[in-house]
């Protein structure tokens, strides 16, 4: 959520920044006018209340003097009616301002590339060289079906489109991947957490999914509960409405969880395979940091995600997202894109973002600065470390052999009982 004080005092700069995210200047101008009206009304209310207090004191004195107070009582009643009317108007204005501040995206950091969409993203670096096959590589969905480890047909029968069963070594591979990821993140100082997979609406608001992106979620009918779209939601809300001790920062959390997404607006995109599902596993990283340290922590988090890909020997690239492609809550985002041979393309497998104080303001997560004793908003960061299903897809395609078998990456073999190959 944006700071109304920053918008008020640095309006032109904020408007310029948000314009790069597609926010119409007219929206901000309306917000500015409403905020000015609110402050004017507040001045009027305080003036009227002061007058009312004066009249009240005069009435009390008149009664002590046995004087007639009818006129003063009428005047006080008029003042009270004016205050009541202005308070009602203030409530309407506050609701409108809340709507503005909760539906506007975060202000992009100065280092974010300016652009309209993903075509304006900037590649930062690459790691690894895509493998050259001496045979036509298969898509991971064909490999999975031929190996008998991925079953979309029965997933569709049991549930519907974009659902599947993992079987045998496919299920073992999925489990090996997320256990490996959690172990690696643990080495980097992350505390492993098992979160609730259902959260309330306040939690969804805290991380920015609600109210703007309600259609992308699975709500439990007639309840205050939602299936989590990512473990970021419960992890980032862990300290909601709390004040932390500054000396304890930064704090690192990691969790593996299922993620549930309706994929509204994704009809026709990635209809086959593991890239876009309604339910998938993901290992998430979340950090709570002091503002002056948060961008250093973003670089570390991105490196933590890269470490997984490097140890799995999967070629990837790091991309800085443009202002027009970043997520709603992010001030800066790096995407990690892994090489998918059958698509001859890099596909997103992780997003690592610094939301600065955007989520912390919504969730009221603060810390007491040990230097000056003041209570301040901290910065929150989140990143995929990694999307597990997409990692399965990348391994199947990059490690496939001409006979249809798939070699298991060395880093995962200890998690698979020493198995080296998945054979038809």
UniProtKB/Swiss-Prot annotation:
Main location, first listed in the record: cytoplasm
Annotated PROSITE patterns: AA_TRNA_LIGASE_II
Alphabetical UniProt keywords: Aminoacyl-tRNA synthetase, ATP-binding, Cytoplasm, Ligase, Nucleotide-binding, Protein biosynthesis
Name recorded for this polypeptide: Serine--tRNA ligase
Stored InterPro entries: aa-tRNA-synt_IIb, aa-tRNA-synth_II, aa-tRNA-synth_II/BPL/LPL, Ser-tRNA-ligase_type_1, Ser-tRNA-synth_1_N, SerRS_1_N_sf, SerRS_core, tRNA-bd_arm
Pathway: Aminoacyl-tRNA biosynthesis; selenocysteinyl-tRNA(Sec) biosynthesis; L-seryl-tRNA(Sec) from L-serine and tRNA(Sec): step 1/1
Domain notes for this protein: Consists of two distinct domains, a catalytic core and a N-terminal extension that is involved in tRNA binding.
Keyword Cell membrane: no
